[in-house]
Amino acid sequence: GLSTMGLIPFCSTFAMFGAGRAYEQIRNSIAYPKFNVKICCSHAGVSVGEDGGSHQSVEDIGLMRLVPGMTVIVPADAKEARKAVFALAEFQGPAYMRLARLATPVFEEDYPFEIGKANVLREGKDAAVFACGLMVNEALEAAKLLAAEGVEISVINVHTIKPIDAACVTE
């Protein structure tokens, strides 16, 4: 298709359909030949509770992570999603980006985004929480509550699930 002509297709649909229903096509027709196609799926996870269980794709990250050569991105908020789209346009190869339905502001405009690099958002000495997507905001809120009780945790935004930032995880 378009990717064989030097263009960069950005495909968009609900995660249930993009990762679930189209899995075989993504695996065989995009990832195996390493076509430069970006799959951006919204309404992922349980953030679409009111839409019912048939639309709650909780397995999309796992499915896309298993596909050889597929890069998997899960932005924490709209600002990070915007930066991820621009980064994916420059990135060569198949990629899946999971977007949630809920608005969860986390970052300022000057927040750095690099595919494959996790970001430490809060330093702590007692424990570390690695989060992606909607859970980044939840982890930051939990860190505030724990800090009030004298427990200092690190919060790491792992927006790139694959390839994982192994150096950040092992630090």
Q: Whereabouts are the PLM-identified features?
A:
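Core nucleotide-handling region used for phosphoryl-transfer chemistry
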Residues: 147-171
